[in-house]
Amino acid sequence: MSFVAHPNIDPKSLGKVGVLLGGRSAEREISLMSGNGVLAALQSRGVDAHGFDPGLQSVAELAAAGFDRVFIALHGRYGEDGTIQGLLEQLGVPYTGSGVLASAMAMDKQATKRLWMTYGLATPRFAMLHADTDFDAVAADLGLPLIVKPAREGSSIGLTKVTAADQMRAAFEKAAALDNDVIAETFIDGAELTCPIVGEGDSAEALPVIRIVAPEANYDYQNKYFTDDTQYLCPSGLDPEVEREVRALAVQSYRVLGCRGWARADLMLRADGKPFLLEMNTSPGMTGHSLVPMAARAVGISYEDFVMQVVAAATLDLHPNEHWKPE
């Protein structure tokens, strides 16, 4: 499925659309920003769109809402990890983005990295941390600096760049307060990149790469969403051959995970020009600071046109006719 600048989508053909926003995760605030942007875009195109907050409203209310499809603008736990996707499968309501398994896999950084490694895709070396881990040994094995973060959070929440072995325990405890699974990975010194992908299977394609230049190379939660100090370069300014390699790696990583609809791969480009995959976001941000709309604009696709195409592609792991129905 190719995304185009001016899609011919009849808003009435989309039916009643629910925009799931807010939720219960640590990224609730960002989800509200994304969801409200998506809701406004759909309504501006004449779509019968309604916001729905699973953090405040019940499953029974969702089932009774009568949505013909939903746009998942939830981020993090319960919205990006296969949970809401499984519920929507049960309800038979088509939804945007990846299915249950791909969402769950992509949310778990350990599972994602192990799968990528199995397919020979470059990702930083890592180790799982526990309270009784020999932190000095991990630091010696992975090398310093290294990154410690929760295995199942996004938006850099709970992340620490460790520059000395004696910082490891504090970094672990910070991440462990958010997730039982904590990961340490080798720090890749180089350019921070992100690359959106749209479509499914062989039709999946990458949008332009964005190069991120953050203050003091610190692209944290604050710099991602609440300051204007971070520079986003699109076109990326990379050598064209390097850009092609990054885009190809992003698409390959998306296909390996079984993603569909849309997602965003985050990468690092080492000083020698080798790209490394960091993680896959299956429900990317759609705020005023978000990167997917920026990449879309670079190829002439407006925010509204992009949203319309994402929601038009809403589907289920199973075709609706394959869902069990009582006699």
Curated annotation (Swiss-Prot):
Stored PANTHER family: D-ALANINE--D-ALANINE LIGASE, D-ALANINE--D-ALANINE LIGASE B
Keywords attached to this entry: ATP-binding, Cell shape, Cell wall biogenesis/degradation, Cytoplasm, Ligase, Magnesium, Manganese, Metal-binding, Nucleotide-binding, Peptidoglycan synthesis
EC number: 6.3.2.4
Chain sites annotated for binding Mg(2+) 2: 279, 281
Cofactor note: Binds 2 magnesium or manganese ions per subunit.
Keyword Zinc: no
Chief site of localization: cytoplasm
Cofactors named for this entry: Mg(2+); Mn(2+)
Annotated source species: Cupriavidus necator (strain ATCC 17699 / DSM 428 / KCTC 22496 / NCIMB 10442 / H16 / Stanier 337) (Ralstonia eutropha)
HAMAP family: Dala_Dala_lig (MF_00047)
UniProt-annotated binding residues for ATP: 139-194
Record: residues binding Mg(2+) 1: 266, 279
Localization: Cytoplasm
Molecular function via GO: ATP binding; D-alanine-D-alanine ligase activity; metal ion binding
Function description: Cell wall formation.
Transmembrane stretches, start-end: none
Official protein name in the record: D-alanine--D-alanine ligase
Pathway of action: Cell wall biogenesis; peptidoglycan biosynthesis
Family: Belongs to the D-alanine--D-alanine ligase family.
Pfam family for this entry, one: Dala_Dala_lig_C
Reaction equation(s) it catalyzes: 2 D-alanine + ATP = D-alanyl-D-alanine + ADP + phosphate + H(+)
BP-aspect Gene Ontology terms: cell wall organization; peptidoglycan biosynthetic process; regulation of cell shape
GO terms under cellular component: cytosol
Domain ATP-grasp: 113-312
